[in-house]
Amino acid sequence: MGWGTGPPSWSELERVLSGRPGRTDPEAMYPGDGGDSPAWSRKREPYLAEPIRPVDRPTVPYAELHAHSAYSFLDGASQPEELVEEAVRLGLEAIALTDHDGFYGTVRFAEAAKEWGIATVFGAELSLGVARPAPRRSARKAARGRGRAVRYAATPEFEHAAAPDSAPRTGEPDPPGPHLLVLARGQEGYRRLSREIAAAHLAAGEKGVLRYDIDALTAAAGGHWHILTGCRKGHLRTALADDLAAGETGLPRAEAALRDLVERFGADRVSVELTHHGVPADDERNALLIALADRVGLPVLATTGAHFAGPEQRRRAMALAAIRARRSLDEMAGWLAPAGGAHLRSGAEMARLFAACPDAVANAVALSRECAFDLRLIAPQLPPFAVPDGHDENSWLRELVLRGAARRYGPPHANPPAYRQLEHELEVIATLGFPGYFLVVHDIVSFCERNGILCQGRGSAANSAVCFAIGITNVDPVANELLFERFLSPERDGPPDIDIDIESDRREEAIQHVYARYGREYAAQVANVITYRGKSAVRDAAKALGFSPGQQDAWSKQVSRWTGVGAETGTDIPEQVLRLAADLEGLPRHMGIHSGGMVICDRPIADVCPVEWARMAGRSVLQWDKDDCAAVGLVKFDMLGLGMLSALHYMIDLVREHEGVEVRLHELDLKEPAVYEMLSRADSVGVFQVESRAQMATLPRLRPREFYDLVVEVALIRPGPIQGGSVHPYIRRRNGTEPVTYDHPALENSLGRTLGVPLFQEQLMQMAVDVAGFTAAEADQLRRAMGSKRSPERMRRLKERLYRGMAELHGITGEVADRIYEKLYAFANFGFPESHSQSFAALVFYSAWFKLHHPAAFCAGLLRAQPMGFYSPQSLVADARRHGVPVHGPDVNASLAEATLENGGREVRLGLAGVRHIGSELAERIVAARVEHGPYTSVLDLTGRVELTVAQAEALATAGAFDSVTGPSGAERSGGRRAALWAAGAAARERAHLLPGTGPAADAPALPGMSALELAAADVWATGISPGSYPTEFLRARMDELGVIPAGRLLEVRDGSRVLVGGAVTHRQRPATAAGVTFLNLEDETGMVNVVCSVGLWTRYRALAQSASALLVRGRVQNAEGAVSVVAEHLQLLSLGMGSRSRDFR
């Protein structure tokens, strides 16, 4: 299928940026999307048709009107694009997508069909509930009126609330309940069907449960649907089977079912569906159906009832059926489809199968022509934004901009360029009809500001002076000479894209504000399709093949997160499991929810795409992902949770509370040398965006001295790693080891600030303006065309325009022109927007400032904001200790629910919520009871005030949270943590309904104390953190004997020396641009070590490297310019004596 892939190697990109000769086919090298992605994008690129060899025989006209894709979730085995491609290969005139209870795959289906020029029909197979005795009609109407009004304001006349619920579609080989196959007759039919699917999903108030009312469906159709009698689960086939089982040759039940459909939907809106999968029983059944159709006066229509594209996918379809039923393939014997299979067939084959009834094939074609339409016709708009009297959207936006400009820029005469830019942007926004979009985003940002929620716009929105003036972004694009057209231009084929970063712990408030302001009917969150990846594919493949749960789990743990299943080597996973898992990989498994994407419509969203409940309370979610929404024209707003904003807010609060200092981020001195000196030492654990292995290797080489250096640093690591001796050409030029050169003097204007090396997407646009005379809007077209490869023809025209402009304006031709083009093409895919780097660089400085000046608050703020960032809480605490910050474990009389400060803000106290089995809610209750009634005096006192399970009480004791408690006899204190654990178990068993003293004895017998290693192991088990030590401390004597170099001393080791290092594995990382190289981060009590593992070494030690919690590594030191790493030659297991878990990344 024609979807884009990932980036090339770092070495290839570095060659291009350095201007060295090499490959001359950039189109083959640099796939990407030209978007705001840091390296390569997870954005789905537009579908591109690839050559298909059609069937080698004369075709009979045919249209397939009953087909399920993989978006029937475990009941279809082909991607929508695969169905379209096979339909094209078979010469079909049209194809319908009729997935179960949704339009999940319709956009991908429509995009592929548009590319191939095949007509599309849209429908769904509805899963009706099991029938139950119905109340009188009037009572049912009343019940429906009450049903969902509180939660979802759907059309009241089509309520479903009193209907029976559908049965779960998983866990059973043949889920009970009838199906109804509905085809939308054009755009209006689609709208009505979408609304009814949404109403059914929402009526039951629970994700995955549907509640269709057949009477409501009847009323909703209005002549805009066409009903096929469906598969064996349809009303007609079910009734027919009942008649045959009862020996009723007159088929009374089947005839009644068919006449009921006619009465409900009309004789011209029902067709009797015939299927034939190549078995004799199909002929007998079809003959009976044809006779029934003649009796009732209905046409017949042939379908394949396809659940996969071609015969080669039948094995995959059978496996998915077993997975859906939670059974093995052996256990599914008798339930699976006949050997012929439900796959697409050509018109010629269908004509042969239905030779006795040729009209059935012709009728399919005729109906497809009546129903087909282009999905793009449904594109909605934003709702009108409520503005004050006397204003429209344009005038109100202008008013807000002028107010903000006065604050940001002063009066017009003080900054004429800024006001000229604002006027230009307002004209473009008005021309494109987007003022409402900016007003919506401004409203969200204003809500956050009013409620004390940290937020900022980022990405290409920071190129806009309008966004800066009205407070959406905090980067001045006029002062920084950023191109507005990178964000918005007259030629743009869609609304702008503004990402808002909101502190993650309060993002839900902003989301609920949008629901409250626009109504749940007009706003919804965007879906995230959860697809099969390596581990889940292996687990489910093993399950389908009948292996035990333990074996499934063991094999899934052997799968790398970086490679496809098909590339796995060195495992003991059976070949048959790997083969099937590779076949499943990439298929959708279920729907999730996007991290922050929301859409807002001028009409009920369900008119465009069905909505359903998410797992999270209070969230409704579209059936489309962000790429689907963009393709159809839904206006999406990204409210992204950013953990660092939460952490910064916590840091500000902690410093105010414990040190009496009010920190205002915008007032910090961005020129403070001490902050840059700290970062130049790569002392950046926990600092936003510059804490990764690659960033920490770059900081000592770059040695940032001013704010713009941080802007560069944020962008510099994109798209890939600084590997081995390979140094970014910008750093070589910055440090004077390589001269600053330009391929042509005309490039100095665009590349001078970055020493002749393109780093930002805005630069490539400026390059096109300077060397070829492009307008800024044309330059953005070039960037986007290069980035997404949307149209080869468009790319060819722009390339010709670029070469012609270079020749005419500056006489640039030949090799120089090719080099300029190659740089443009390479960086169109991977360049970071400078506006984005500017936004993030501020957060780099703010977080670094806290680390330097308030290290305890910095640590506690990061702990409160978990999960976030690159490092685990254990590593964050270890780094705080290395900076002289004492860290104390959780204590029932000293801790809050979350981490806090003590001793004037100089020490950190861990929170109770981080203790195993406790969580935030219970921790808050423990703290509240202490605040209300005073400190706890014993374990029994605590369990008397706050009910705990035995597991919870014992986890608190294991964490040392009772260390400050003295019991009546002092036994808890004298016996140490073991005595507290004894007392905790006994106290937790005391209950109000039991007589005092009838439970186990709370006083512990004499118990031995715990060693320092045992205490650290207990801390790690209970909280994941050993606050007073690091696990390697207890092995140091043995490690010294072995000659292990502590991490903190590696900088002293000469480059090229062979060393032995060791520590806990905190990260495993294999960037897509690293050509298979894997990086490990080891940590000991003195610091961290970056370990480089070649492809060969990783293959040799794969099982150990992938699973070990700690390692000894022998290798060669690379020590240059303050950055040190070890190139591994040998790996060996290091036993810590306690748990440790790594964070693995791409």
UniProtKB/Swiss-Prot annotation:
Places the protein is found: Cytoplasm
Output the InterPro entries linked to this UniProt entry.
DNA_pol3_alpha_NTPase_dom, DNA_pol3_finger, DnaE2, DnaE2/DnaE/PolC, DNAPol_HHH, NA-bd_OB-fold, NA-bd_OB_tRNA, PHP_dom
Positions with biased composition (Basic and acidic residues): 12-26
Uppermost EC category: transferase
Which residues lie within the region annotated Disordered?
A: 1-43, 154-178
The UniProt function text for this chain reads: DNA polymerase involved in damage-induced mutagenesis and translesion synthesis (TLS). It is not the major replicative DNA polymerase.
Q: What is this protein called?
A: Error-prone DNA polymerase
Gene it is expressed from: dnaE2
